[in-house]
């Protein structure tokens, strides 16, 4: 089972403050573990334009029609001072890894320098931090009913309002997560 380019959808019983009602986009999953970005936990009072200002990035060819007031996500509890940019191709940036045909993750400054210009990728999600699981840890959490899984959907990843992503991700597999009981059992 490889969950790269899938969503992890927190079950209602998962009460960890970081992962409660979260949707995690899995960027890498292999025999050594998994790495992902939470895509529905906005950081308070931090938007893309604030990140660019803090890093003193002011593109010369700024296009005022491109909005930079999108929220920056808390990508996870690890390396919260490090930026991760999920975006649609191209992957021409210095530190890009293609996750799927339609999704790339970049950690280099050059992608930030394109934001707000005609050169930026068409869809962008900026996060600080990431989540990871050691070998076998995610599989055990799945057996413990901590998560649902669904193939990733770019509309949910990039276009669905943040507050609706948890519910919409569960709908991908036919579940209305708001009607689920808080504790799951084993059959």
UniProtKB/Swiss-Prot annotation:
TM region positions: none
Gene Ontology cellular component annotations, sorted alphabetically: cytosol
PANTHER family, per database record: UNCHARACTERIZED PROTEIN YQGE, UPF0301 PROTEIN YQGE
Family: Belongs to the UPF0301 (AlgH) family.
Protein name (record): UPF0301 protein YqgE
Protein source organism: Salmonella paratyphi A (strain ATCC 9150 / SARB42)
Gene: yqgE
